[in-house]
């Protein structure tokens, strides 16, 4: 299946000069969504994953069903201030300024094997911050999975040296 054909391109969003890759059209397509989850499941079914960590918010969309299919737990990595118990926090750089991600301190058991999932990798800043959170919890980052990679932005070079699965490259 050609997943790229199911991803809408929106020019000049969220600002002029940006070509936004909109996955809502992929999500609306029953066959496309099923194919996406099935491809990710096949890629990691032999990895003994304990937890799938989804990055807010679109990482939740793919992470939860993937965790279910892999027989793993799902762990949300949230923007600051959204979790109710004790958290680990990591600050990371944005194009202009910084942001913070958080995870519950008790989300992952020591040595737990973790797969981080998000919809897209661009510069890699958010995904790298998520890896730091996994380490703070005592987890073992096994791999990353992204639906889309924007290759020109070089995000891979900012990530830990673990396997990366990408379904669509631009």
UniProtKB/Swiss-Prot annotation:
Q: What is this protein called?
A: Adenine phosphoribosyltransferase
Q: Does the keyword Transferase apply?
A: yes
* SUBUNIT field: Homodimer.
Family annotation (InterPro entries): Ade_phspho_trans (IPR005764), PRibTrfase_dom (IPR000836), PRTase-like (IPR029057), UPRTase/APRTase (IPR050054)
Principal subcellular localization? cytoplasm
Family named by the database record: Belongs to the purine/pyrimidine phosphoribosyltransferase family.
Question: Which Gene3D superfamilies does the annotation name?
Answer: 3.40.50.2020
Q: What is any one GO biological process for this UniProt entry?
A: purine ribonucleoside salvage
Keyword Glycosyltransferase in annotation: yes
Tell where it localizes. Answer: Cytoplasm
Q: Which Pfam families match?
A: Pribosyltran (PF00156)
Q: In which pathway does it act?
A: Purine metabolism; AMP biosynthesis via salvage pathway; AMP from adenine: step 1/1
Q: Which GO terms describe its cellular component?
A: cytoplasm
**Which GO MF terms are attached to this record?**
adenine binding; adenine phosphoribosyltransferase activity; AMP binding
Q: For this protein, what is the EC number?
A: 2.4.2.7
Protein function: Catalyzes a salvage reaction resulting in the formation of AMP, that is energically less costly than de novo synthesis.
Q: Which catalysed reactions does the entry list for this protein? A: AMP + diphosphate = 5-phospho-alpha-D-ribose 1-diphosphate + adenine
Q: Which keywords does the record carry?
A: Cytoplasm, Glycosyltransferase, Purine salvage, Transferase
């Amino acid at each position: 299946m050609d997943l790229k054909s199911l991803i809408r391109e929106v020019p000049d969003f969220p600002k002029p000069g940006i070509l936004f890759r909109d996955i809502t059209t992929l999500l609306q397509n029953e066959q496309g969504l099923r194919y996406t989850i099935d491809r990710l499941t096949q890629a990691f079914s032999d990895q003994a994953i304990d937890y799938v960590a989804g990055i807010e918010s679109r990482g939740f969309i793919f992470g939860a069903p993937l965790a279910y299919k892999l027989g793993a737990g799902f762990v949300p990595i949230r923007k600051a201030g959204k979790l109710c118990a004790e958290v680990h926090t990591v600050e990371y750089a944005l194009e202009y300024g910084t942001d913070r991600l958080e995870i519950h301190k008790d989300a992952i058991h020591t040595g737990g094997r973790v797969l981080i999932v998000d919809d897209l990798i661009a510069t890699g800043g958010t995904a790298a911050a998520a890896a730091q959170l996994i380490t703070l919890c005592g987890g073992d980052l096994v791999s990353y999975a992204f639906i889309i990679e924007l290759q020109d932005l070089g995000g891979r070079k900012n990530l830990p040296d673990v396997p990366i699965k990408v379904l669509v490259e631009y």
